């Protein structure tokens, strides 16, 4: 069973390399959209945007997460909560996929919060005072990013639109782009939102490598 898991993880690594090469050699773009809720003139749709950039990013995520998973299968093998760790790790990866593929700000917020929640649980994995304090710092910094994403959603609401690919600096308020950049700075640990990154080292070593 362990060998099958390792093979599947290696397959993800090769799949990631394949997606990177595919994204680098294609210019095609596909938008899949379905209406989830509709009331009179207001509707909410679920969209998936697949273009060269999202394919490359998916490839990068799969390559890194697959490599980390192969390492984890050896490094975390004797941990009591080994299965729980892997479930949290792949919930983290799925949340990243949400942010890559879905151009709707509401659904991006779900992926964003998924990253925040799984980051908190992974940093607090060892359940001691240091890891819990580090997890709380990580969570609070992510809440700043959540607030900024919610602010961008409210700005987009004034435009009667939540879809990122319809954003145009010539038409839409430039403050939306600025707020989204600031939100991204909290997640990527840019100054002045970088305090959580060294604190996240309290997580298991493979998590630190994945986050960095």
Task: Pin down the residues of each PLM region.
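Core, highly hydrophobic multi-pass alpha-helical transmembrane subunits of bioenergetic inner membranes
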Residues: 1-212
